[in-house]
Amino acid sequence: MEFLPVAPDHDVLDCRLPSRQTAPVVVASPHSGSVYPAAFLAQAAVSLAALRRAEDAFVDELFATAPALGMPFLAARFPRSYVDANRESYELDPGMFEGPLPRPLNHRTTRVAAGLGMIPRVAASGEAIYRGRVPSAEIEQRLETCWRPYHTALSMLIEQTHRMFGSALLVDAHSMPSSASGMGLRERDHRVDIVLGDNHGESCAADLVDCAERWLSARGLRVQRNQPYAGGFSTQRYGSPGLGRHALQIEINRALYMDEARHEKLPTASVVERLMAGLLEEIGDQARTMLLPRPLAAE
């Protein structure tokens, strides 16, 4: 299938709302975007195919039933290699940029050290994305046109959900390369199908994570928690169980649903789509009962 990048100045988000929200759940996909600005491609020292390897390809399609299940759904249309919405706003490598920086950058993180800040320095292959330094003015430009609209919309959906139900759960949907699915395992020939990330117990009620793990395991999927992915910026920012705000990151092994080399869906993608629909339905049912608002203390 021919892939044609486009460069719109708007419409950077895909936001789909249910006709009526019936579950305290918001589903988001920050890394499935595939709209590549032409100016970005002109800056790139690597091929479009190399850039696309960073995408959580087709994840927005795997979770597309969310609105039909009464859950808002948000996906970034901009690509992760251009702006990573699962990073802090100024989590950046200052050495990438030319010109005065807008403010001090948070550059002392393991993600920045790996070249994977809000504006990534390297592609999935480890190759440098850019031919030279990036004009520092692009930091604010990309924040204003991509990062801020995404998090403004996501924050609004979560806050509306919390006001409606007294609690809210963010399901942060991702995929992982099959090469990463054995990381952290003692037996290297065993691969993980799903990684559930709750920031090591800090971002989501344990009962909900237990429920998701049981449901997936009962269907023959190999599930692991927090290894190698415990959750990124969104999980940490939006997961505060003590405040009735929960966040659970779900990583799906790409080999389950796509040919990673050809960047194409496999026939099994429809099976994974049905599984994710079933998981969302189960999570929604459980969230309605598990995430009841706490009664106010007597005065």
What are these regions (language model features)?
Residues 1-170, 175-248, 252-299:
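N-terminal catalytic or cofactor-binding beta/alpha core of small enzyme domains
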